[in-house]
Amino acid sequence: LYAPTIGASMADILTGKVSPSGRTVDTFAADASASPAAQNFGDYAYYDENGNITKYNYVTYEEGIYVGYRYYETRYEDTVLGQGNAGDYDYAKEVIYPFGYGLSYTSFDWSDFKADWSGDTCTAQVTVTNTGDVSGKDVVEVYVQSPYTDYDKTNGVEKPAVELVGYGKTAELA
């Protein structure tokens, strides 16, 4: 985001000249330092053969696939289903704004959802109708849930509860 342009854009949104249609690109947690990704955060230095600190640093990534929304959605599912080591977890207290969250000055209705499979490829289609009083754009996000099979469990395969596989934004709808 180029700072000098934010003023005009923000003014257009606040005055209603433009209806906001963006979505959050990450999960906004109440305490970001409590996420698995933050547990390994730090400035770890490499040492040379004499034990002296070098100018090179590293980070150890141990959270696997459970970063961003995948962590929060999977932990929520584990809590609901009583599986794994999710423990006592309250999604509403942990997540302030979920991945893909957004506001608009109008409202939309989705209908006529279709999913067509051709081999391993799925094409999803939905009709989006503006039901509000002002023009705006909407974002449709498509998530899938993969079965967690006995093979996955036996072999330690990690799968998130849900995964974003596609999205699209409508044109301006009156």
Where do the PLM segments sit?
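Intrinsically disordered, low-complexity Pro/Gly/Ser/Thr-rich segments with frequent PxxP/GP/PP motifs
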Residues: V140, Y151-A174
